[in-house]
Amino acid sequence: RAAKFGIPHVRVPHKDEDRMIELFKVWRVDLIVLAGYMRVIKNPAAFPCPIINVHPSLLPKYKGLNVVERAMEAGDKETGCTVHYVNEELDGGEIILQGKVPILPDDTIESLTKAIQRMEYGILPAAIEYVKNSRQSNHVDNAKYQLQESNS
């Protein structure tokens, strides 16, 4: 997709973090955004800039994989998504922004996943803007924001 939009790109095996770090330094990357990146960054502190991730649950609840299924199996009334900073702990970094999604009685894993993805599309740009503004002012107030999806 990057080529389609004229964005410089290169494929690097996910296990070669040293090469990724090197490229991000050369390209002077300001922010790394993980969306659908189902890998663990082993040493996030070695990267030259912040890394944020969008995760399909309301962290700190349901870290890791299969989180939509786990929320449904637990009988939760709502779930959602979280954008957070990546640190050494899996899905354990500081929360930037969360969006809540109700779990409806007739929801399936597929329908709930789609509802969460719609919320992710809404909060990820806002989270990126928040990180950008925080870095420009050299001040992070640790505010947690939440959005709510309607039942429509």
Language model: regions and residue ranges:
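One-carbon transfer enzymes
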Residues: 1-152
